[in-house]
Amino acid sequence: MAWWPFSRNNKPGVPEQDQVAAAPVQQRPAEPLPTNYTPGQRLLLEDTRPRFDTQSSASQQAVQRERATLADAWKTVRWEDFSLERMAGIPCFRDAGMAGFSAMVVAGSVTFLFHKNPVRAANWGVGGLLLGSIVGWEQCRMQRRRSFQVAEMARQTVAAKEAPMLRKPDNAQKAGAVSQASELPPKKPWYRFW
């Protein structure tokens, strides 16, 4: 269902929001043109009715999520979902795995060197794997969230920035300013030779 990243409905590499938007939506038949339309006249968006009914689709999704049960979610799980290729496609999985394995080696090695007990070292290694994976996962997610926020701020800054290339330069005004400057008598220089 919605919480399992490998369900049959999910496509790899496509966020859930995009998949919901790409889901088939009931489209209305072609709308008749407004009564005040004349051939060749441009139609404005405000003159037409919306193509999609956003209220019903949101309520349908809410009803579908309410009906989701653990049994329905379990039916979507397959053995292929646990392949290394699919797991490597999950964002932050690699970083979490590397941090977990590093923590496992460090915790297991230090415990083994200190206590000389392989069972105890293995237990601490597994604990280090779990804890390191969680820390690596959360750290990667935080970095991704921050980078997405920076990218969004950059997008907003570029959108709000004035685009000088859209204005045509007024060459006549510039030429007039240059000619006026050349017509003025030369000013007395600020320096003086003696």
Curated annotation (Swiss-Prot):
Residues 138-194 are mitochondrial intermembrane. One of its GO terms (biological process) is mitochondrial cytochrome c oxidase assembly. One of its GO terms (molecular function) is unfolded protein binding. Its main location: mitochondrion. Keywords: Membrane, Mitochondrion, Mitochondrion inner membrane, Transit peptide, Transmembrane, Transmembrane helix. GO terms for cellular component: mitochondrial inner membrane; mitochondrion. Residues 14-30 have a biased composition (Low complexity). It is found in: Mitochondrion inner membrane. The chain crosses the membrane at residues 96-115, 120-137. InterPro entries: Cox20. Residues 1-40 are annotated as: Disordered. It is a multi-pass membrane protein. The keyword Transmembrane applies. Residues 116-119 are mitochondrial matrix. It holds the Pfam family Cox20. Involved in the assembly of the cytochrome c oxidase complex. Belongs to the COX20 family. This is Cytochrome c oxidase assembly protein COX20, mitochondrial. It comes from Eremothecium gossypii (strain ATCC 10895 / CBS 109.51 / FGSC 9923 / NRRL Y-1056). The gene is COX20.
